[in-house]
Regions:
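Short helix-loop capping/hinge segments that flank enzyme active sites or metal/cofactor-binding pockets
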Residues: 4-38, 42, 92-105
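Structural helix-boundary/capping segments
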Residues: 28, 88-143
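An anion/phosphate-binding loop that grips the pyrophosphate of nucleotide cofactors and donors
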Residues: 48
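Short, surface-exposed loop/helix-turn segments at secondary-structure junctions
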Residues: 29, 60-80
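Small-aliphatic-rich amphipathic alpha-helix that forms the alpha element of a beta-alpha
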Residues: 40-43, 73-96
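Short glycine-/small-residue-rich Rossmann-like dinucleotide-binding loops
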Residues: 56
Length: 143
């Protein structure tokens, strides 16, 4: 796979190279784990309309922090730990602003829905926005 301008990011290059190092058995184990997780989420959503989870374990990183995260695999893993699993399982999600930190950085939450349940997610998102003003808040640097 040739590197093009699109793939010059060090973080993306590291992901591609990491994928090249996986054996067929490793890949099969990953696929089985993804299927197991998807089944667990399906079982939860059989009894619930939605799941609520944070988008990330801390406030949105600054631009400088985001640039350095790309070079730190563990920090990058923490950044996506609450969103990536649902990218793998294929469950629709909607992220919503849930406020600002004392320092004025945005924080986000997400609803996770049943497969094919995008309408329910949109209704839930609209309900949150009707009773809050979080979606109108702006960081100080944007005011």
């Amino acid at each position: 796979f040739p590197y093009t301008t699109l793939f010059r990011s060090p973080a993306l290059r590291r992901l591609i190279d990491g994928g090249r190092e996986l054996s067929g058995m490793d890949y099969q184990r990953i696929l089985l784990e993804a299927q197991r997780f998807t089944g667990q989420v399906e079982m939860l959503l059989y009894e619930l309309d939605l799941l609520l989870a944070p988008v990330q374990p801390y406030a949105a990183p600054t631009h400088e922090q985001l640039s350095s995260l790309a070079l730190d695999p563990e920090a990058n893993r923490r950044l996506i730990q609450f969103t990536a699993p649902f990218n793998v399982s294929g469950h629709p999600c909607i992220s919503l602003p849930i406020g600002l930190t004392e320092g004025g950085l945005p924080m986000g939450g997400q609803f996770i829905g049943r497969k094919g349940g995008e309408a329910t997610l949109c209704r839930a998102g609209m309900a949150v926005q009707r009773v809050s003003d979080w979606h109108r808040l702006r960081p100080q640097c944007l005011k």
